[in-house]
Amino acid sequence: MPISSLVPLTEIRQYCLQLGFSLSDQEIESLRGYLCLLTKWNKVMNLVGFTTWKTICSNLIIDSFHLAIFIRSLSLPTDPLCWDFGSGAGLPGIPLRIIWKEGSYWLVESREKRAIFLKTLLAQYPLTQTYVYCGRVEEFMLANCLSDVALIVSRAFMPWQALLKLIEKKISFKGVIVLLLNDIPKNIDSCWYIQTTYPYSIGGEKRFFVALKKAS
């Protein structure tokens, strides 16, 4: 049985509506492509801890949909350059790019097999100005100019304190860092401040997106 038949378009649309999100026909097609490839590769690579497309949607992809709402509320420049650190299985970046197509978006992943998955996915289901870099974040930052970066996204790349320390040294960075956390961070270094937060709940569990900027 083709794997696409295990992820029906109409069911995806209805399920997304149940979760509170309405997607266009093209977005549903792209989401199905992602779910098909993710569930297929997950059987041999253990990309995510959930095994069915519905549990992947309700526990992981929904974060990306909320992230899109949050990012739209930020005052990003036109055509923003965005970096996604520790992209892994493409979460939150791939579903985010399906529904939020502004600017260019780099998925940075050091683990080769996961980077191959992301490149395979984008070769089969291209997304607007979305690219993959296979290598360490430190190497990626050395090869690119942080002064041009409007947004850095991190879901589970490293502890947020370590990430802020890493970026803190790059004095040219003037953009926003968005973190997915289970609580609003406390005792933030004086080099940073919380610009805004976005709380939401999934299955009774509270989660937060937190936007941070460097203090002047």
Curated annotation (Swiss-Prot):
Q: Which Pfam families does its entry note?
A: GidB
Name the principal localization, coarsely classed: cytoplasm
Query: Looking at the UniProt record for this protein, which Gene Ontology cellular component terms does it annotate, in alphabetical order?
Result: cytosol
Q: Indicate where this protein resides in the cell.
A: Cytoplasm
Q: What reaction is this protein's catalytic activity?
A: guanosine(527) in 16S rRNA + S-adenosyl-L-methionine = N(7)-methylguanosine(527) in 16S rRNA + S-adenosyl-L-homocysteine
EC main group: transferase
Q: Which residues bind S-adenosyl-L-methionine?
A: 86, 91, 137-138, 155
Q: Which UniProt keywords apply?
A: Cytoplasm, Methyltransferase, rRNA processing, S-adenosyl-L-methionine, Transferase
- What Enzyme Commission number(s) does the record list for this chain? 2.1.1.170
Recorded hits in InterPro entries, A to Z, give: rRNA_ssu_MeTfrase_G, SAM-dependent_MTases_sf
One Gene Ontology MF term: rRNA (guanine-N7-)-methyltransferase activity
Similarity remark: Belongs to the methyltransferase superfamily. RNA methyltransferase RsmG family.
- Fetch the PANTHER family from UniProt: S-ADENOSYL-L-METHIONINE-DEPENDENT METHYLTRANSFERASES SUPERFAMILY PROTEIN
According to its UniProt entry, the function of this protein is described as: Specifically methylates the N7 position of guanine in position 527 of 16S rRNA.
**Protein name per Swiss-Prot or TrEMBL:** Ribosomal RNA small subunit methyltransferase G
Query: What is the organism lineage in this UniProt record?
Result: Bacteria, Pseudomonadati, Thermodesulfobacteriota, Desulfovibrionia, Desulfovibrionales
